[in-house]
């Protein structure tokens, strides 16, 4: 590290609040830049987090049907409100991708990872002043377990046999099989800790949590207002006094709101205008690359998608580079009909799983095998699924003609898309933010019993490998299993996955943020509200 890099490192420590003025000046003196030290420190101190102000943000994915039940969280608006503002998990994926403790200070497993003990953080209070206990954690986890739970996270916890409190500060979770990634699962945005009602249920209706902000007003899908929790247990987090979250589904409306100063930050910047937006004075466009993915789920329980030859034909008529250029405007990379992305460690290489290319002749062959040479299908899309989803459908319609396939693109309204179209229509547009581990995304979306198995796909070999991979502690063997699972999804699954997308957000230049931003979800891992500040 040269002197310039060392100075930047010290300044970053000042910004993050981990280096005092005295220590900075002493370090600068030792480096031989003592005369410049006060100026260098002042510039860093000015960028350091400061409390105060109201952050106004334009979010997508809200609906008037949204509820405060964490098990029913569907999209960005409620993820940000519940996961990012008012509640906490046991664990958290840091901006670095490392798993750290949130309401669990630490955890340990037995030798085969079939039992996990979580040590619950002491001195934490809910917004109503109630102290956090192990029983709150037990009831919050059980809220997502069992056939009657109805939680979208139930598929993640099917292997849980029991959750019990061991005194007031320990929670013991026993699993039916080993799961080396189980603590990662508990960072899922559904598995939030709520106060226990004392009868085994939790109080989710009040919106009470342990998070950095307290819910004051909530008009589902339209507007929410929170204020800083004065007793927040995290040091160096939650700097804004107030948060106003607005549901802005239309990308042009979001952009206009930012340009006119009606909001301070927006998510899902319209990719075709991102370059121009970034040139406007006072606005900063920030792309982050992770596992966010465009998917086109086909319901494999309904004709004609119950025939894998049809599914393969539709995967083969997508001109992926066209999508990257014309839909993503270069913000992303090609997908290969499997959900394991660039931020996952066991991703199959192109040598292991060759990139699928546009091949209308091969698509014709598959349709001939299915005896459906003149296939006609409907594709349902709305821009809330992903920016440009309807345009993508049009591109696909044109590229499918060479294979003799007629695709009727049906534009759907943004409002109600996730409740009325996704998982209801036979073929639709969707997106996923990806997951930190292979087991997580496979268990939540591709397992036969997953509540979000939006293709209704069931593959016995895949599901057996899922259990094996989850319990395997040897990294090399684990990789072999997950690569094989990716091949199965690629060749048999009900999802066409053309692209991995960068998350592109835009902020006004008055907002300060850490140098490293989380890429596990949008908006700094959906923790922007507690990680950012006004400069």
Regions found by a protein language model. Name each.
Residues 1-19, 23:
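N-terminal secretory signal peptides
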Residues 58-111, 142, 208-210:
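N-terminal lobe/hinge region of extracytoplasmic solute-binding protein
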Residues 84, 94-98, 186-238, 242-244, ...:
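Gly/Pro-rich hinge or "lid" segments in bacterial periplasmic/extracellular proteins
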Residues 119, 153-196:
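Surface-exposed binding/hinge segments that line
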Residues 231-276, 397-398, 406:
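Ligand-site clamp/hinge motif
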Residues 334-369, 386-389:
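Structural transition elements
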Residues 356, 402, 408-417, 441-509, ...:
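Extracytoplasmic/peripheral linker and loop segments enriched in polar/acidic and small residues
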Residues 507-535:
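Long beta-strand-rich cores associated with HINT superfamily self-processing modules
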């Amino acid at each position: 590290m040269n002197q310039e890099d060392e100075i930047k490192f010290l300044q970053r420590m000042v910004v993050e609040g981990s280096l005092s003025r005295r220590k900075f000046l002493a370090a600068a003196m030792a480096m031989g830049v003592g005369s410049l030290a006060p100026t260098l420190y002042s510039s860093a101190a000015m960028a350091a987090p400061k409390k105060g102000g109201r952050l106004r943000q334009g979010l997508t994915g809200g609906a008037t049907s949204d509820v405060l039940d964490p098990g029913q969280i569907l999209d960005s608006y409620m993820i940000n409100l519940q996961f990012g503002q008012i509640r906490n998990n046991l664990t958290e994926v840091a901006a670095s991708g490392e798993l750290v403790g949130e309401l669990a200070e630490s955890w340990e497993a037995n030798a085969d990872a079939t039992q996990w003990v979580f040590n619950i953080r002491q001195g934490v209070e809910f917004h109503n002043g109630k102290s956090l206990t192990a029983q709150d954690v037990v009831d919050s986890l059980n809220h997502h377990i069992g056939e009657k739970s109805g939680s979208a996270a139930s598929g993640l916890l099917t292997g849980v046999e029991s959750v019990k409190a061991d005194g007031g500060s320990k929670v013991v979770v026993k699993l039916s099989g080993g799961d080396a990634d189980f603590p990662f699962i508990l960072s899922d945005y559904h598995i939030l800790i709520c106060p226990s009602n004392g009868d085994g249920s939790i109080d989710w209706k009040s919106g009470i949590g342990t998070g950095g902000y307290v819910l004051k007003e909530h008009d589902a899908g339209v507007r929410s207002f929170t204020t800083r929790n004065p007793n927040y247990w995290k040091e160096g987090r939650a700097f804004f006094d107030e948060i106003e979250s607005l549901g802005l589904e239309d990308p042009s409306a979001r952009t206009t709101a930012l340009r006119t100063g009606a909001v301070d930050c927006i998510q899902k910047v319209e990719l075709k205008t991102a370059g121009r937006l970034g040139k406007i004075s006072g606005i900063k466009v920030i792309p982050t690359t992770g596992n966010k993915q465009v998917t086109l789920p086909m319901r494999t329980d309904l004709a004609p998608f119950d025939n894998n030859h049809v599914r393969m034909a539709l995967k083969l008529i997508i001109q992926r580079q066209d999508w990257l250029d014309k839909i993503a405007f270069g913000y992303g990379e090609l997908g290969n009909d499997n959900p394991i992305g660039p931020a996952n460690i066991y991703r199959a290489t192109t040598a292991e799983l060759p990139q699928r290319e546009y091949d209308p002749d091969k698509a014709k062959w598959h349709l001939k095998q299915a005896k459906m040479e003149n296939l006609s299908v409907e594709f349902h899309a709305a821009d809330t699924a992903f920016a440009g989803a309807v345009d993508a459908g049009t591109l696909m319609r044109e590229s499918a003609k060479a294979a003799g396939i007629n695709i009727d693109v049906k534009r759907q309204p943004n409002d109600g898309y996730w409740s009325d179209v996704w998982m209801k229509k036979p073929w639709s547009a969707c997106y996923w933010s990806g997951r930190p581990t292979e087991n997580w995304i496979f268990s939540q979306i591709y397992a036969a019993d997953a509540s979000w198995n939006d293709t209704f796909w069931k593959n016995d070999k895949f599901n057996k490998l899922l259990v094996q991979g989850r319990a395997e502690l040897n990294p090399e063997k684990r990789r072999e299993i997950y690569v094989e699972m990716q091949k199965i999804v690629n060749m048999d699954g009900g999802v066409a996955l053309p692209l991995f997308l960068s998350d592109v957000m835009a902020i006004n230049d008055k907002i300060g943020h850490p140098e490293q931003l989380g890429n596990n979800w949008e908006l700094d891992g959906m923790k922007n509200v507690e990680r950012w500040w006004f400069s």
